[in-house]
Amino acid sequence: MAIERTLSIIKPDAVAKNVIGQIYARFEAAGLKVVAAKMAHLSKGEAEAFYAVHKERPFFKDLVSFMISGPVMIQALEGEGAILKNRDLMGATDPKKAAAGTIRADFADSIDANAVHGSDAVETAQAEIAFFFPGMNIYSR
C-alpha cells in the first residue's frame, strides 16, 4: 500500500464529550501519524464551502448547523493506506450500523451527530487537506 494522507475532523459532538485523546490514540495505534492539526470553530461560510458537494442534499442545512454548533478538531493523517484505514476506524456513517469498537459505534449519538468526518478518496483527501491546511502547514515525520 502507498503512503497516503487523509483529512479527519472530530466533530462538535465528540469534542464536547472530551474524547479527542481517545480518538487520537486509535489513529496512532492503527499506524496513522498526525501531520497537521488545529482546533477551530467553523463559520457558516466555511462549513458551507467545505460541504458544498452536499449543497443540494436535504440534510445540507442541518449538517452546516451542526458543524458550526461548537469547536471541531481538524487533522491531516498520514500512513500506509491512510484513507481506507481511517474509514475503517470511523465505522459506518450511522452509528447504529457501525461495527463494535469503531469510533462511531463508541462515541457517536446519531447519523447526524456521528463524531467524525474522513475523506473518502485520494482526490477528496487532497482537496479537503488543502481547504484547511493550505501551503506548508503539514509536517511528515
Swiss-Prot record:
What cofactors does this protein use? Mg(2+)
Q: Cross-referenced CDD domains, in alphabetical order?
A: NDPk_I
Q: Which reactions does this protein catalyse?
A: a 2'-deoxyribonucleoside 5'-diphosphate + ATP = a 2'-deoxyribonucleoside 5'-triphosphate + ADP; a ribonucleoside 5'-diphosphate + ATP = a ribonucleoside 5'-triphosphate + ADP
Q: Which Pfam families match?
A: NDK
Q: Which GO terms describe its cellular component?
A: cytoplasm
Q: Which GO terms describe its biological process?
A: CTP biosynthetic process; GTP biosynthetic process; UTP biosynthetic process
State the UniProt keywords alphabetically: ATP-binding, Cytoplasm, Kinase, Magnesium, Metal-binding, Nucleotide metabolism, Nucleotide-binding, Phosphoprotein, Transferase
According to its UniProt record, the EC number is 2.7.4.6
Briefly, what is this protein's role? Answer: Major role in the synthesis of nucleoside triphosphates other than ATP. The ATP gamma phosphate is transferred to the NDP beta phosphate via a ping-pong mechanism, using a phosphorylated active-site intermediate.
Quaternary state and interactors: Homotetramer.
Name recorded for this polypeptide: Nucleoside diphosphate kinase
